[in-house]
Amino acid sequence: QAHFADTWNAWSMAERKVITIVALSQINGMIDVRKFNMQKLVENVTDYSAELRSLKEAGTILKIGDNAWKLTQEAFLWWWADKVRAITRESADFEQWLCAQEIDGLFTKEERKEMSDLAQNVRAILGKGAVTLIEGFAKGIAAGALKAIGM
């Protein structure tokens, strides 16, 4: 792993972008539940022709089609995927994370905020006509949940 980290740190930002585009295309743009906009990334890979050539000459990547490339080392691909997981995972500090886990009624504060954000998005999309419907639905769910727990 130290070898991969040293190699990664030696690359320029442009080379890291190329490696990321190649690696993501190799795993269909998904790492666990994270999904990336592959169409845009693959379209932009030709902007990095010098880096593609350099990485190909170094034996790091291999051309497998017109705009298709792959990493030559499978172990590096999985090291890279672990790095991306760490980078893209929630970056809240410990205190923020812990507070978000606190139960506030039936839900954690984080879940309550997510539901509130979702409701606001739905309301904005559907307009005022649907607000009454959504509020009635939400009140019905809340009443049913309270009844189910004996309140």
Sequence positions of predicted segments:
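A short, conserved structural fragment
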Residues: 56-66
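Membrane-inserting effector segments that mediate pore formation, membrane fusion
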Residues: 112-151
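Minor-groove-contacting beta-hairpin "wing" of winged helix-turn-helix DNA-binding domains
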Residues: 67-73
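Short, amphipathic alpha-helical interaction segments positioned at domain boundaries
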Residues: 75-106
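Residue-level detection of the helix-turn-helix DNA-binding "recognition helix"
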Residues: 53, 57, 81
